[in-house]
Structures are given as structure tokens and as C-alpha cells.
Amino acid sequence: MNKISIAATAASLLWGISILNASATESPYARLESLDKRFDALIAPDAKIEKIADDLKWSEGPLWDASTKSLLFSDIPNNVIMRWHPDKGVTRFLERSGYTGAAPFTGYEPGSNGLTFDLDGHLTLCQHGDRRISRREADGTMVPLAVGYNGKKLNSPNDLVFDNHGALYFTDPPFGLPKQFNDPGKELPFNAVFRVAPDGTISAVATELEAPNGLGFSPDYKTLYVANARAALPIWKAYAVQPDGSLDKGRVFADSSSLYKEGDGVPDGLKVDIHGNVFATGPGGVLVYSPEGTLLGRILTGVPTSNVAFGEKGSTLFITANHRVLRVRTLTRGVPLPRRK
């Protein structure tokens, strides 16, 4: 998503003096805020929140790479994918990750955004500047998977997920265009959720959201959650996945309108745990919702926060928070990425 420049959140509240009488745990980089006892079963009240990367411009797209036991993530303004390894620290993994053109990019977000692996383990990435989805082969070659719809260029693919049958779903707001919603190069009349079938056929499966952003499946792949990254309508929708892969009209799963006084940010990237809880970035940091849409608690980062990913053994939550990347151990596990059987 695009970086929102808003003043940072006020100083952290003391233990036990938080909104809704919530309990809170503090660290130098973020604090936990429990609003429901179920939150304490997901993240221990004394869990340590650590910083693993800093001095970035706008971190996004965290993805755990089990083959190398490392975390990949995008630094969008710098047009690069970074890698963090617990023993080697932070290194540059892929230069020109989102914009490969010869002419200078005139916007703020040329780089890659969302990252994932396909069912065969190939890195698949949203390339803002090139306005496409690509798969990276073992030799480094980029294979475009989606570049347009009905003869028109995509806006700037933002985030992506595969279902368990190999279909790719991705969001396409205009945040990667130099002038975003008002960019003269914007060709599509909407900002859609798209589906790319295993045979390569692309279809628009949801077009009503102004700024579709982060997305993720429920553990049974029957529901697709999609964030709308707009302050005027900061919601997440839940769509029922139909047998043919299309989506129903959806319902509002959660609404964060009341939380804007508590912190910066809009609905952005999200992940789902094995119990169906949704870990969604939004106002203040990371918001944790039950499968029914009840807000259980928050990880308050004090800065606009873009995305999350589960990694290591599946129970560590990595958080891309503005210029930093954080991690916290959880008591749950993320839904594993689907793999070909």
C-alpha cells in the first residue's frame, strides 16, 4: 500500500490504562493490547517484540522462505527485495524488483509489493512500476503472469495469494502509479480483485472496492478476506468463494472507522492463522480479529504498518512497519502456503 504520512501515535499508555480497559505489554518498538482473553491465547502477554530491520523507506510484502530459513520483504521506494537471515542479518536479494524500465520512474513506489510462492515454490511478486504480476524462475528470469485485462494495462498490482488449486488472486489499486487515482496513465475504470486461473485466464472477481489491498484465505479456502485501504471506508470484506473460483458480493467482515483516533494507517496486508483468526494491518498497527469479526487485540506499532507474515516454524509473526521490520513469537500458527501435491 502507499505510505500514509500522518503524525505518529501518542506515547504508549501505562499497563492497564488502555482503551476498553485492555491490558498492554510494552517494548521499545511496539506494544500488545489485549481486548479479549482469546488474544492472550494467541500472543502471550509478555511476548517480546523485536526489531530485525531498520532504515528502510517503506517495507512491505513479508514472506518467509523456508528453503533458506530467511525472510524476504519489499522496500518499495528503493525498488528492491531485501532478505533477513537470523545469522547474516539484512542483505539485498533482488534489485529492480518492481520497475525494470530504462526511463526514470517519476512516482514514489516503483518497487515490488506483495510476495508469495506458487504451488511449485517459485517466487511470485507484484511489480508496481511494471504494472504486472511475475513469476521468478530459478535462473532469475521473470515470467509475466498478468499484465492487463480486456486489452487495458493493470493499475499496479498490490498483493496476491494462491488458492489450493493453483489459481492466483491479486488486488490492483493504483498506488504504484505516479499520480495514483488521478494518474493519466490509468487505463482501467475500476480497482479490482482479479483471479488468474491455472490456465492463465484472467477475470475480475470483485470491482466495487475503491482500494482493494491485502487479501488472504480462510483455512478451508472457502472465504477470501480483502482490505479496503481508504480512510473514508476502512473495512475488510469477506467473500464466499464459489465452486468456479468466482466470488459472491461479499459482506463487511470488520470496520476500523472508530480506531483512527488511536493510530495511523489504513487496512492493508493481512494473514490468517490455522484457527481462522485474521491478523490485519490497520489503524495503529496489527489488528487481530476472530473468525466472526470480533477485535481481540492489537499490536500497536506507533507507525503506519503495511503487512504481516508467519514464518520460522510457522508461529513467528513478522511485521513490516514503515521503515522497520519487527517480529513477535505467537502461540498460534499461520495457514501454510499451498503446495502442489
Q: Which residue stretches match the model-derived regions?
A:
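Sequence-structural signature of mature extracellular/luminal beta-sheet repeat domains
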Residues: 23-341
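Positively charged n-region of N-terminal signal peptides that target proteins for export
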Residues: 1-4
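Bacterial N-terminal signal peptides
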Residues: 8-21
